[in-house]
């Protein structure tokens, strides 16, 4: 499952087939093609591009492992990126880690995870009881209701990342600064 939020619309890229095979490779290629096209269109329009994630450590792992896993076996799939292409992207100034910004700007006595920080911005998830572990259970359940809940959860994670980004850009309104404690 890959997901992106462009500021207006959540774009899910999901396969419900067994993982590790052609269906997963095609899904990854669909996501990468959408991302590449979106970035190129922005550049062509004279815009700057920022692709934001919450914790690039995990995202980099999944991007690289997907490229590594599928590059040789499914080279016939259009849009499937090479390891070199993924490495160039994650090393580019367009790939931005919101969590790194959060760690630099905020202190959190209960942590700085997305759910904690996004709630401080006023964001809430439609799927209140879903977290990373529960999302795996939803995927494995495979029912239409579980799939809908998983896509809702992933979409909310994407929108929550945008909410945290806006919150930080606005100066984290409503939160005390370290100067308040000096």
Region annotations inferred by a language model:
Residues 4, 15-136:
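Conserved DEDDh/DEDDy metal-dependent 3′-5′ exonuclease domain
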Residues 7, 83, 175-178:
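Intrinsically disordered, low-complexity, compositionally biased regions/tails
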């Amino acid at each position: 499952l890959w997901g992106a939020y462009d500021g207006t619309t959540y774009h899910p890229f999901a396969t419900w087939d067994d993982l590790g095979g052609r269906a997963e490779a095609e899904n990854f290629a669909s996501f990468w093609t959408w991302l590449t096209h979106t970035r190129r269109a922005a550049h062509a329009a004279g815009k700057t591009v920022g692709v934001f994630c919450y914790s690039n450590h995990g995202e980099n792992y999944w991007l690289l492992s997907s490229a590594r896993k599928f590059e040789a076996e499914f080279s016939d799939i259009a849009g499937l990126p090479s390891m070199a292409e993924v490495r160039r992207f994650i090393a580019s100034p367009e790939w931005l880690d919101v969590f790194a910004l959060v760690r630099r700007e905020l202190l959190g006595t209960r942590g700085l995870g997305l759910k904690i920080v996004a709630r401080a911005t006023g964001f809430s998830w439609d799927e209140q009881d879903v977290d990373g572990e529960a999302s795996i259970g939803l995927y494995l359940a495979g029912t239409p209701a579980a799939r809908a809940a998983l896509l809702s959860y992933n979409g909310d994670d994407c929108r929550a990342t945008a909410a945290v980004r806006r919150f930080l850009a606005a100066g984290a309104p409503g939160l005390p600064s370290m100067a308040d404690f000096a």
